[in-house]
Every structure is written in structure tokens, then in C-alpha cells.
Amino acid sequence: MKLQERLGGANIYLVGMMGAGKTTTGRLLAQRLGYSFVDTDAVITAFRQRPIREIFAQEGEPAFRELEQQVLAQVSSYHHLVVATGGGIVLNPMNWSYLHHGIVVWLHVPLAVLCQRLRQDRERPLLQEQPLEERLGELLQARQHLYAQADLELRITLEDTPETVCDRLLETLPCILKPMEPC
């Protein structure tokens, strides 16, 4: 049975830290599965017609997290989607009720790799106040146990390309679908 048939239209939610590659990997994965792609941050940006950093600055993180929950609630009512989520989506317990309607995949990227990827990024609102490595370390420490609740953890190295991550994900997904296949 093909992977698409075994998925039965279930959404695939990519979670992980900012800079993990959720958007890039998500687009590739959606294309390979014949699914549509949604980025929750892009939906929020389009809806509010301004960048996330401005939403954070003008309305605060709690208001952003509320928007994020509303978007996830709407997105989860659809099927055949690969969804790239914001890095903090796992912080709200209510969001897990939506995420568990599909398959949750944690793109687990080591701190050193995240720092290398995000060093030049000035758009991330949560990275504006402290040294990058210190702030990312704090965020990762606070979120890691939540990311670990994902159905599947995919460890990513500096050498991995979005294509190799997508390939590994497609190879690993059947291992967690029922009926189980030996992996």
C-alpha cells in the first residue's frame, strides 16, 4: 500500500525550533506527497498584513499565541496538508488537541546548528534581546520536552539538506502508521 493511502489524508504537522527548516522541508514534503502546504506564520502574517515581529512588538506574545491557536484550529479542520508551525506552537496545551488530529513530526536540530542558521536573521522577535546562543538555548530547553511529545522525532545535522530530511521523513513515516511496517 502506498504511503499516501496509508496516511488517509491525515495532516502532517512539522514542529521544532525556529531555523529547523520546517517551511522548506514542509514544501518539499507536500510536493512529494501530493498534499497542500500551509505555514501558520505565513497565514498570520497575511491575515494581519504585517510581519510577526511587528505583531509581537505592538500586541505582545500572548496576542500572537492566541492568533496562532485560531489559525491552527482552522487549519486542523482540513486534510491532505503538510503544516509548518511556529516554533512556540507547542507551548499552548490546547494546540496539542489540534496537532493530535494528524501526525506530529519534530525536526530536532542541535543548538549549534540553529545558531549557525540564525546568526544573520534579524526578523525573529524572540531573538532580539540576548546573545543568540544564550537565547536559543533557553528557548530549546523550555520547549524540548514539549517537542518530544511528537509522534516522530527526526534528528537533523549540519550536513542534512532539505531534500535528505524529506527523504528520511518519507522513509520513516511508514514506521509509525498502522498497520505497522518493520523498519
From Swiss-Prot:
Similarity-based family: Belongs to the shikimate kinase family.
UniProt cross-references to PROSITE patterns, sorted A to Z: SHIKIMATE_KINASE
Cofactor binding note of this UniProt entry: Binds 1 Mg(2+) ion per subunit.
Positions that bind substrate: D41, R65, G87, R143
Subcellular location field: Cytoplasm
The protein, known as: Shikimate kinase
Residues engaged in binding ATP: G19, A20, G21, K22, T23, T24, R124
Residues binding Mg(2+), per UniProt: T23
GO biological process: amino acid biosynthetic process; aromatic amino acid family biosynthetic process; chorismate biosynthetic process
Pathway assigned in UniProt: Metabolic intermediate biosynthesis; chorismate biosynthesis; chorismate from D-erythrose 4-phosphate and phosphoenolpyruvate: step 5/7
Assembly, per entry: Monomer.
UniProt GO cellular component terms: cytosol
This protein's UniProt keywords: Amino-acid biosynthesis, Aromatic amino acid biosynthesis, ATP-binding, Cytoplasm, Kinase, Magnesium, Metal-binding, Nucleotide-binding, Transferase
A UniProt-annotated Pfam family: SKI
EC number: 2.7.1.71
Residues annotated as transmembrane: none
